[in-house]
């Protein structure tokens, strides 16, 4: 990057070729090293012997972990932090006027996006990427869990933690000694165009991130291109129309090594153009049992032998998790794990953190936290909640994520949230956006959309409450014995759980 040119940060620009290796980076500095995706990559480079340091705005569990590994973390972002670095890594959350970017540019240092580091780590490994609007973290976590249990010791880079036993969490990143790397492929900014995985999993292609892509056609085209870069197999859900459209758009040579999956019997599907098909059959949960039973019909193209009908008993609820399991198990089998061993390991998977994660119970009111932030994810979550808690009142505190997403999907959010009995919508988590750019968008945008629904919202109480603390107290006062309250969203609503549990204790008379 020339020092005489203006600073342009393009996450889609590929900085390395297939021959590059981590040692080529030299001393590497991460801006925002405590971020979920950045901390994992920093740890993996450190394990490869690269000299790594970084900066962040505040201490966190992630920065604490990095420091215990011997990685220096500076708090506050200043020009001097990049003085010793040869390579500076940024994420899409970092702007060109960041003082460390400005200093690195002025000094002529190599500035690369986090996706460049992930692409570099994939070189020389059997890489599995998981892309899609929904299910990335759960599918990549489940696949990593299966491979760990199979003794493969994979590396994995997952945008979150994994649920462990007794309410514990396991780190979402690991630098394994095996030759497999599992990673989420973030489609939000187009940076997944850099990846050339051995296996590309596409969990679904429902429109999202239209602020980047502009329209659904360009969004789907990005997935078609991503599938075309896979050097081995493509695994894609065709339960949603967009996924089927992507499959149909794939060139014949890509279809020939594609494995589609879904809940529709094969004979009821259109011609798949030579793609193999995994049928998810008999998915059900005995009400309140906590076990999702299904059978995966794995074709010879997956097993490299005879077709196999494999029973699976999942501890993660919902049909959406049956789909996630189909993708994870299919990939594991393609990587050499037996169908029986893959299914057994999947049955011990407790879920990714913040995915249907029980945070506590007060006076038999259960609080569950979930990352769902798209209308389809919320609908799947609430369907799973009805299966898991069939006799309970389902209450939701939802924090919308991004003003643009709230604007694009207000009516869809209203329809999905109508599956709950009570809903409070808090202030919107802005992430990379500014309220000033969306002056007419607020929690009331969704509430107003709900008021316009004819039947879907009948019986659902829905209110906007900007302040999360007030929202927690209000919901606690409404709760009764046996209710389940979900905190839902991709922002900082996850920090509300303790406030909510405390509020429930303070208003325990309403819970009895």
Curated annotation (Swiss-Prot):
Positions annotated to bind ATP: 132-138
Cellular component, GO annotation: cytoplasm
EC number(s) recorded for this UniProt protein: 6.3.2.8
GO terms under biological process: cell division; cell wall organization; peptidoglycan biosynthetic process; regulation of cell shape
Keyword Nucleotide-binding: yes
Similarity remark: Belongs to the MurCDEF family.
Protein name in UniProt: UDP-N-acetylmuramate--L-alanine ligase
Species this protein is from: Bifidobacterium longum (strain NCC 2705)
């Amino acid at each position: 990057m020339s020092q005489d040119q203006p600073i342009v940060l393009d996450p889609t620009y590929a900085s390395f070729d297939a021959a590059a290796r981590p040692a080529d980076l030299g001393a590497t500095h991460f801006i925002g090293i405590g971020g979920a995706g950045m901390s994992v990559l920093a740890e993996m480079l450190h394990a490869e012997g690269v000299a790594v340091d970084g900066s962040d705005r505040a201490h966190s569990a992630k920065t604490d972990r990095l420091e215990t590994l011997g990685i220096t973390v500076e708090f506050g972002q200043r020009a001097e932090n990049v003085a010793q670095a040869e390579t500076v890594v940024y994420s899409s959350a970092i702007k060109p006027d960041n003082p460390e970017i400005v200093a690195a540019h002025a000094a002529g240092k190599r500035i690369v996006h986090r996706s460049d580091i992930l692409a570099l780590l994939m070189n020389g490994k059997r890489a599995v990427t998981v892309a899609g609007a929904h299910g990335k973290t759960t599918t990549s976590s489940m696949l990593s869990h299966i491979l760990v249990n199979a003794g493969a010791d994979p590396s994995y880079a997952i945008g979150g933690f994994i649920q462990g036993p007794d309410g514990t969490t396991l780190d979402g990143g690991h630098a394994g000694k095996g030759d497999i790397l599992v990673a989420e492929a973030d489609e939000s900014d187009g940076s997944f165009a850099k990846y050339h995985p051995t296996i590309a999993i596409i969990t679904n292609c429902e429109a999202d991130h239209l602020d980047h892509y502009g329209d659904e056609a360009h969004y789907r085209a990005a997935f078609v291109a991503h599938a075309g870069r896979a050097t081995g197999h493509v695994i894609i859900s065709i339960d949603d129309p967009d996924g089927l459209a992507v499959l149909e758009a794939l060139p014949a040579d890509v279809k020939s090594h594609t494995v589609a999956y879904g809940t529709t019997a094969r004979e009821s599907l259109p011609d798949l153009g030579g793609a193999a098909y995994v049928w998810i059959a008999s998915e059900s949960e005995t009400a309140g049992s906590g076990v999702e039973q299904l059978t995966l019909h794995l074709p010879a193209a997956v097993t490299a032998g005879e077709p196999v009908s494999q029973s699976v008993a999942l501890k993660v609820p919902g049909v959406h998790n049956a789909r996630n399991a189909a993708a994870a198990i299919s990939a594991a089998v393609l990587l050499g794990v037996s169908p029986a061993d893959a299914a057994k390991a999947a049955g011990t998977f407790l879920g990714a953190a913040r995915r249907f994660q029980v945070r506590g119970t007060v006076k038999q009111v259960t609080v569950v936290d979930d990352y769902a932030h798209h209308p389809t994810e919320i609908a799947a979550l609430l369907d799973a909640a009805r299966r898991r808690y069939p006799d309970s009142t389902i209450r939701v505190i939802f924090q919308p994520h991004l003003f643009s997403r709230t604007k694009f999907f207000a009516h869809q959010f209203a329809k999905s949230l109508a599956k709950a009995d009570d809903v409070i919508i808090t202030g919107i988590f802005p992430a990379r956006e500014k309220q000033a750019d969306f002056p007419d968008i607020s929690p009331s945008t969704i509430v107003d959309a709900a008021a316009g629904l004819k039947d879907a919202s009948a019986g659902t109480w829905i209110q906007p409450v900007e302040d999360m603390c007030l929202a927690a107290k209000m919901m606690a006062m409404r709760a009764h014995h046996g209710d389940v309250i979900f905190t839902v969203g991709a922002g900082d609503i996850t920090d509300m759980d303790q406030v909510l549990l405390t509020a429930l204790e303070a208003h325990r008379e309403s819970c009895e």
